Amino acid sequence: MCNKITEIIINGAVGTAPLSILIKNTIKSVMSGGGFVTHDQFKKAADYWKNKKQNAMPEEKLKKTVLEYINSNNTCALATGTGDYVRCTPIEYSYHDGKFWMFSEGGEKFIGLEKNENVCLAIYDKYDGADNLKSIQVIGKADLVEPFSDTYNKHAKIKKLPVETLKKLASPMNLICVTPVKMEVLFSEFKKNGYSSRQTINF
């Protein structure tokens, strides 16, 4: 490992990544028993789908298909984080008014939510072969809704939760609202109609 770090310093590193990042990635790679992975190799992997030719689906048709899938499910994996801290929480959701809504008693996801509004959530089917892939990744902004505000009470009504019952709880239920910024959709079935299996919706 020392030889590889020395090589980075002598040769001036690879690509444009800061020296500290390259050294950190070298240590991580060696400690995990893997080969030496450069910044450029990480970037190439990250950009894999960006560089693929895309045959876009008509936006309205895509949105209709995505909405049907979202409404046919009720559980997502919600990723939150701040600094080196990350959390991924399975949580029930509802979707209305173009946003995702989640009631939560609490938990460590709020460590990230306090300091970082940027979140990601995923809805997906279990793997059943490459021809049956179906998933949505949502990048969005999270807000906490004020307890017993009009917005809070409206969602409680949609969930058929009596507001008076909620008011009797020792601590109010937290209501998380996620506004989508981008949805990355992967449906194998799109290929049957001549479209790319991966589609993107920007909001």
What positions do the PLM features span?
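Short, basic/aromatic recognition patches
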Residues: 58-69, 73-75
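Intrinsically disordered, low-complexity effector-like regions enriched
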Residues: 113-114
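Short beta-strand segments
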Residues: 73-106, 121-125, 134-136
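Charged, gly/pro-rich active-site loop segments
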Residues: 9, 27-31, 35-58, 134-203
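Short Pro/Gly-enriched beta-strand edge/turn motifs at strand-loop
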Residues: 71-77, 157-160
